[in-house]
Amino acid sequence: MRQGRTYLKTNDQVEVIAGKDKGRVGKVLRVLVDKDKAVVERANMIKRHTKATEMNQQGQIVEKEAPIHVSNLQLICPECTKTGRVGKKVLEDGTKVRYCKSCGESVESKS
């Protein structure tokens, strides 16, 4: 499998399309390009048990997000608010942008 080719970026709005959190919508917190995975806000939550230490007398159970493979995520277009596939194209001025294949609009952040 080809690695390092992902269409997701940090702060993108995505929907989980497969797995235990199917249908959940969240923001991408981190993209792991080398593993083709992304961490999505409040999706794929796991529990980690921490041992008691001298500084932290009690052990505890910590819930945190685990990475999800990018094939199980679909980007939500900010223009048409639908989930869909994303393409990449080069504009006339030479800049590369991602675009929604259903409405044709750019999905890049307006900053």
From Swiss-Prot:
Q: Which GO terms describe its molecular function?
A: rRNA binding; structural constituent of ribosome
GO cellular component entries: ribonucleoprotein complex; ribosome
Keywords from the named record: Ribonucleoprotein, Ribosomal protein, RNA-binding, rRNA-binding
GO BP of this protein = translation
**Superkingdom, natural source:** Bacteria
- Quaternary state and partners of this protein? Part of the 50S ribosomal subunit.
Listed NCBIfam families: rplX_bact (TIGR01079)
What family does this belong to?
Answer: Belongs to the universal ribosomal protein uL24 family.
Q: What does this protein do?
A: One of two assembly initiator proteins, it binds directly to the 5'-end of the 23S rRNA, where it nucleates assembly of the 50S subunit.
Q: What is this protein called?
A: Large ribosomal subunit protein uL24
Q: Which organism is it from?
A: Desulfotalea psychrophila (strain LSv54 / DSM 12343)
